[in-house]
């Protein structure tokens, strides 16, 4: 597959309701001109879809997977168990425990099955996209340059004094 056809990042989530958080990943990746795809894949309700996605991700041109999940949040860990690609887990804020259940589920992986765990909710989704950009930037100087420009712009936007 040629470099231009690589999707590079796959954003997956357990349900449609998770999209309101995971859209923040898309927004950052768009700003950085990183190709991505977005899918709904439930570890519990669509296990065959999850399995096929995970075992074929690398063959399909994916470099990094960002997986958002709420509640028991098994999606990132199950995907990580099936691929050696980097998997970044975004805990989705839930009504019952405010996402703490998701955070603990994603963070407490057994040794040998790593998931890079981010913060709960919007901040985690944004940072997952930035971390994916950092990973891709290791081998893609264009992405690295865009990421450095993004961070410089972020720094410049901070006022030196309060108004």
List where the protein language model places each region.
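C-terminal binding/interaction regions
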Residues: 7, 13-20, 24, 99-163
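Short, solvent-exposed amphipathic alpha-helical segments in soluble enzyme
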Residues: 25-31, 55, 82-84, 133-134
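Short glycine-rich or small-residue beta-strand-to-loop segments that form or flank ligand, phosphate
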Residues: 8-13, 37-39, 65-67, 88, ...
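Short glycine/serine/threonine-rich phosphate/pyrophosphate-binding segments
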Residues: 18-22, 47-50, 69-78, 97-100, ...
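N-terminal beta-loop-helix "entrance" segment that forms/cooperates
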Residues: 38-60
